Design a protein with these regions (language model features):
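Active-site helix/loop module of the DD-peptidase/beta-lactamase fold
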Residues: 48, 64, 94, 99-103, ...
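Generic structural signal for alpha-helix termini and adjacent loop/cap motifs
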Residues: 84, 118, 150, 282-286, ...
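Catalytic-site signature segments of enzymes, centered on catalytic residues
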Residues: 80, 154-240, 249-281, 289-295, ...
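Solvent-exposed, acidic/flexible segments
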Residues: 39-46, 62-63, 97-105, 119, ...
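Catalytic loop of the DD-peptidase/beta-lactamase superfamily, centered on the K-T-G motif
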Residues: 25-75, 203-216, 220, 254-515
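Active/ligand-binding-proximal structured segments within catalytic/core domains
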Residues: 108
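Short, conserved catalytic-motif segment at the N-terminal edge
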Residues: 37-100, 119-129, 134-136, 168-179, ...
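Secretory targeting and sorting signals
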Residues: 1-27
Length: 515
């Protein structure tokens, strides 16, 4: 997902959840927080899960889900629901492989924590050949922690549109140097490819690949036998959950395949509820699993600490301050308890969530195979609400679905290109627009006349994606965007030997010059 969508939605949900704990008058300074959730309360919340998940799946229509709950180092709940793929018989179980989307980030920060020998190494600059930022000083000083906490200065989702156009990881990381920068270490903007660059640098510095480092450092030692950072492993798993999107008639279809290898550390992990329950036990166990230390406690603890403000408090709604750690959303509730969470969302068909209260030794994993409509977040929020209050105090599905819908709409153009204005001017002859245009960031763009005389087609990307143009007004056309970051119809404006593509111009990089 693009724009502040996922992080805004996730951040608000975390802030709302943090506000559900009962407030109490606290002395100054307040005492350390104490556990508040009893075993009986957890059992009650677990007992509700079957009905909660089933009801939310009926409401949303999401085809499949898999859920795990860990408490006091025990897996209390592990269950699959629904179908791996609509139209087929295969059902979801705890060993069904799902794409994690951005839930990959806390998994990847666990890998890096395992690769480091000292927490201070998070603050070291680790160079990666081919990667630089626009400011040379920032390039020479940006640390792993800066990129893992989205405070490098890169703009929101920098590089994601290049991935949509089909560019590979090497091209994308090399071209991030053209992105404008916000102030270093004081600006928060969620960036999959900044995160990816840091992870790849850690692996390269150790003479290995990110895939091998992940397997050797975390997956194998933790017994996560069905977990991988490679799309091919997900694709080839016979029991994987296909990604689904919602059709206009309310049904769901596996229309798209999402290959996230270019941003593997940020969004390319695939796993099962069973494997993720082991990872959750490791997180709550401070790096220890089944009596064996897998990840150093001190380097792992650093991932759970706030690194930058991501969600300012909102007095009007009572939302709490939210922070971003190293691959984690970090917040504190009214009782002072640390709450860690992260959601994953592929518009092409996946939605996931992890939420945990370390002090309570309680966490939940929710994996789904439908585009983000709030199901994964709502199941997790409802579970903790019941564990803390004995009942659901909020319709979390309504809250989460509204936030995701709002975030999706926020990326759309303010212009309704489907309806030209009254008195729209005609287009010029096709020859006024056809030709090859160049852009240092996005590469070549071609505009060609359709052989049958039906209009123009715009082509973009290394293996050109073709977009039929629809005339709007004068020298302005439009086309329907496609891919993970699609935003509906976007404008294409020709002027003085240039063409500006509206949705590519979010960081003022979307103007192409005619050759």
């Amino acid at each position: 997902m693009r724009t502040p969508r996922v992080l805004t939605a996730t951040g608000v949900l975390v802030a709302l959840a943090a506000g559900t704990a009962a407030a109490a008058a606290a002395p100054s300074p307040p005492p350390p927080p104490r556990p508040q959730i009893t075993d009986a309360a957890v059992e009650k919340a677990v007992a509700r899960l079957d009905g909660t998940v089933a009801a939310m799946m009926r409401t949303t229509g999401v085809p499949g889900a898999s859920v795990a709950v860990v408490h006091d180092d025990k897996v209390l709940y592990l269950k699959g629901f629904g179908l791996r793929r609509t139209g087929e018989r295969g059902t979801v179980d705890p060993d069904t492989v799902f794409q994690l989307a951005s839930l990959s980030k806390p998994v990847s920060s666990t890998v890096v924590a395992g690769a480091l020998s000292d927490p201070a190494e998070w603050d070291a600059h680790v160079p990666l050949p081919g990667f630089a930022l626009k400011d040379p000083w920032v390039s020479d000083h940006v640390a792993t922690a800066d990129l893992f906490s989205h405070r490098s200065g890169l703009p929101d989702h920098a590089g994601d549109l290049l991935e949509d156009l089909g560019y590979d990881q090497s091209y994308i990381l090399d071209h991030l140097r053209l992105e404008p920068l916000d102030p270093f270490r004081i600006s928060y903007a969620y960036t999959n490819f900044g995160f990816t660059a840091a992870a790849e640098a850690i692996a390269a510095a150790r003479g290995t690949s990110w895939q091998k480092l992940s397997a050797d450092t975390l997956f194998k030692p933790a017994g996560m036998t069905r977990t991988s950072t490679e799309f091919s492993a997900f694709r080839d798993a016979p029991d994987h959950a296909a990604t689904h999107v919602k059709n206009p008639d309310g049904t769901w279809s596996p229309r798209y395949v999402r290959d996230p290898d270019a941003q593997s550390p940020a969004g390319g992990v695939s796993s099962t509820a069973r494997d993720m329950s082991r990872w959750l036990r490791l997180q709550l166990g401070n790096g220890v699993l089944d009596g064996k230390r897998v990840i150093p406690a001190d380097t792992l603890a650093r991932t759970h600490q706030p690194q930058i403000l991501s969600q300012p408090p909102t007095t009007a709604t009572g939302e709490h301050t939210g922070f971003y750690g190293l691959g984690w959303n970090v917040s504190y509730d009214d009782a002072g308890r640390l709450r860690l969470s992260h959601s994953g969302a592929f518009e092409l068909g996946a939605n996931t969530n992890v939420t945990m209260l370390p002090l309570e030794q309680l966490g939940i994993i929710v994996l789904t195979n439908g585009a983000p409509v709030g199901l994964a977040d709502a199941v997790a929020l409802d579970f903790f609400d019941v564990a803390e209050h004995g009942r659901a105090t909020t319709d979390w599905l309504a809250v989460a679905s509204a936030l995701y819908a709002q975030a999706l709409d926020a990326g759309r153009s303010p212009t309704d290109y489907a309806h030209p204005p009254a008195g729209a001017k005609p287009a010029r002859n096709d020859s006024a627009y056809t030709g090859t245009y160049d852009n240092p960031y996005y590469g070549k763009l071609t505009v060609s006349a359709n052989p049958d005389g039906s209009g123009l087609t715009l082509s973009l990307g290394p293996k050109p994606l073709k977009f039929p143009l629809t005339h709007y007004d004068g020298d302005v056309f439009s086309f329907e965007t496609a891919g993970e970051n699609a935003v509906g119809r976007t404008g294409v404006t020709f002027a003085d030997g240039t063409v500006r593509v509206e949705y590519l111009d979010v960081n003022h990089l979307g103007t192409f010059t005619r050759q």
